[in-house]
């Protein structure tokens, strides 16, 4: 029977590189998803343990759910989820969590988002984007000066009514389901925070480009709708790109076609899918790290609290992420010299390449 200490030692050794007794062929076999054959002779990939983040640069026209399904299939991952829906109309950052990274999704969802979006003036639509039908029109067009004067009204903590076509729940049903059935249900305003809102371009009177950085729960479509109403000309989103989600910015994003190409190279033994993964702890960017000994790690791994007192006691409290020999072990609460594990990570399987471990 494997002891907790042996289990910890095993997990630590996984993070220190490939087993010296393992051949390159073995590595390539692991990098490429395993395959079996169905009765109809079509290949079937075995599900496997994959842990990390894929900062997908989602293309226009794909839903967030579809994107998760594609990434999950490419990695043959057992578990996957995303950290914040991105409309089909939109492109850009959709962080997808695989395996144990799904335990850190809330930390990303609570982070800031940054968008670059274009508003088409003169028409309000029921979806607040180009996919809907017009519900109000105007021949008026705003000047850059009028727009600039309006921006402070939408900066800071404000109240915002979500779009009719949104995932907000009303008596257990999604607002977009009710809207598709023809029901117009009044939605209550919600507090949101917009940290920055800038007019980036206003080359013609019919369209304006904005950049916004906002907190959790903000709807950019609602922002365009409300600006159009206050300007007296109506408006809707005609282009939208998310450029930041928590710790994931455009420099870390990978286009879907690049991910597919990497998957193809890995299948032929010429690439490593781990190169597309970011470490699980990337999502814990704003949380302090705390290194512990192997003995303490073994206790935490069993779900037991650890006392950290005396001269070497850490001078901090609250939520921390715990590491042992540089390897993520757990999320824990630290207070009064006691470290209590809340989420323990089991990172056996495919993880981010060493050069992406920070």
Curated annotation (Swiss-Prot):
Major enzyme class: isomerase
Q: Which organism is it from?
A: Nitrobacter winogradskyi (strain ATCC 25391 / DSM 10237 / CIP 104748 / NCIMB 11846 / Nb-255)
Which SUPFAM superfamilies did the record assign? Pseudouridine synthase
Keyword terms of this UniProt record: Isomerase, tRNA processing
The record's catalysed reaction(s) read:
uridine(55) in tRNA = pseudouridine(55) in tRNA
Name of the protein: tRNA pseudouridine synthase B
Q: Where is the active site?
A: 87
Listed GO molecular functions?
RNA binding; tRNA pseudouridine(55) synthase activity
Similarity section = Belongs to the pseudouridine synthase TruB family. Type 1 subfamily.
Its annotated function is as follows: Responsible for synthesis of pseudouridine from uracil-55 in the psi GC loop of transfer RNAs.
